[in-house]
């Protein structure tokens, strides 16, 4: 078992959810728990949010949906964002999973199984309004508008779209997407709608519609919500090195003084990027400590020379992620995003849930 521990504060996640619910006021708020709850534990997070009356959970695939359904029971809505495919349609039906249909082919597949089961099957439709990943194209939407038989046999519960740049409040593309979405919705006046992701929630009430779908903001990846994650690693080795000693693979760091170097038991096999080599930092008792040398598969070295001697000992814990080094702050060091930091948290870490 790993010596490193990821601590997830479920109370913080619930408080983040309540903050988002307060912003949305009259709209429902669901939760994106895909990628195992952004690496933090989809089952544990979903169970915590159910306590706050969250009833809509978004996953990427049928496999994620089945795992969540087995853990949560039937009293919640589980939506599969990647939609339905021939190979998993029966599984979606068996586990009462609702696909988000992204193209006419997926609509055709879901209709086929509706006929096979001789009953209406629930679905969401995803209209592409400009992010250009998934979603029905404008031509496909026009076909649906002109031929409602294309939706025969389907229980259309929501029409959704996804914002491309919602974290930039003043970007005009947000309004372009909103207006495009509203124009499509005019042809489906009795269907509920969902547009806002985490950033979209803070763009204003016009973006909220009937259901918001935050992910990142639940996990503290937003300036207005709090970080619920702490990753700590103990010092497992200490050594005193003289001036001009080389550290790690390829000798990329050379000491410029007599130094005290500590080793921590995590590395790129645990999702801690090699890009942190010679430029990342950890914290010990609120003091910043630099990473020196290459990040290797299972180990990193840190320079603890400037710490008080009383704080340098085997077993002393270093904070890799926490209040001093949030996922977003860490990500900025290596030019990525906090989402990637969280979803890369390795399976070898012990996970501890509090709150």
Curated annotation (Swiss-Prot):
Stored SUPFAM superfamilies: Alanine racemase C-terminal domain-like, PLP-binding barrel
Organism: Rickettsia peacockii (strain Rustic)
Job of this protein: Catalyzes the interconversion of L-alanine and D-alanine. May also act on other amino acids.
Name of the protein this chain belongs to: Alanine racemase
Cofactor(s) for this UniProt protein: pyridoxal 5'-phosphate
Organism classification: Bacteria, Pseudomonadati, Pseudomonadota, Alphaproteobacteria, Rickettsiales
GO molecular function, one term: pyridoxal phosphate binding
Pathway membership, UniProt: Amino-acid biosynthesis; D-alanine biosynthesis; D-alanine from L-alanine: step 1/1
Binding-site list for substrate: 133, 297
Residues with PTM N6-(pyridoxal phosphate)lysine: 34
């Amino acid at each position: 078992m790993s010596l490193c521990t990821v601590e997830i504060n479920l109370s913080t996640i619930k408080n983040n959810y309540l903050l988002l619910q307060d912003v949305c006021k009259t709209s429902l708020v669901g939760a994106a728990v895909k990628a195992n709850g952004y690496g933090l534990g989809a089952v544990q997070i979903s169970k915590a949010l159910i306590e706050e009356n969250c009833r809509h959970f978004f996953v990427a695939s049928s496999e994620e949906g089945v795992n969540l359904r087995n853990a949560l029971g039937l009293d919640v809505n589980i939506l599969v964002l990647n939609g339905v495919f021939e190979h998993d349609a029966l599984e979606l039906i068996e586990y009462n999973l609702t696909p988000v249909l992204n193209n006419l082919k997926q609509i055709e597949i879901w209709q086929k199984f509706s006929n096979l089961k001789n009953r209406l099957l629930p679905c969401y439709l995803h209209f592409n309004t400009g992010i250009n990943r998934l979603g029905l194209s404008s031509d496909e939407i026009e076909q649906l508008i002109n031929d409602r038989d294309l939706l025969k046999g389907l229980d259309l519960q929501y029409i959704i779209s996804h914002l491309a740049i919602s974290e930039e409040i003043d970007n005009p593309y947000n309004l372009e997407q909103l207006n495009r979405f509203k124009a499509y919705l005019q042809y489906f006046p009795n269907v509920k709608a969902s547009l806002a992701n985490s950033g979209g929630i803070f763009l204003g009430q016009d973006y909220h519609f009937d259901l918001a779908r935050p992910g990142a903001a639940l996990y503290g990846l937003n300036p207005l919500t709090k970080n619920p994650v702490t990753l700590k690693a103990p010092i497992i080795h200490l050594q005193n090195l003289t001036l001009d000693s080389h550290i790690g693979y390829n000798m990329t760091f050379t000491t410029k003084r007599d130094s005290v170097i500590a080793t921590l038991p995590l590395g790129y096999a645990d999702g801690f990027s090699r890009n942190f080599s010679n430029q990342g930092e950890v914290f010990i008792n609120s003091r910043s400590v630099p990473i020196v040398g290459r990040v290797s598969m299972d180990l990193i070295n840190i320079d603890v020379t400037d710490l008080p001697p009383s704080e340098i000992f085997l077993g002393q814990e270093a904070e890799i992620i926490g209040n001093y080094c949030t996922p977003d702050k860490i990500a900025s060091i290596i030019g990525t995003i906090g989402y990637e930091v969280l979803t890369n948290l390795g399976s070898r870490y012990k996970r501890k849930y509090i709150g």
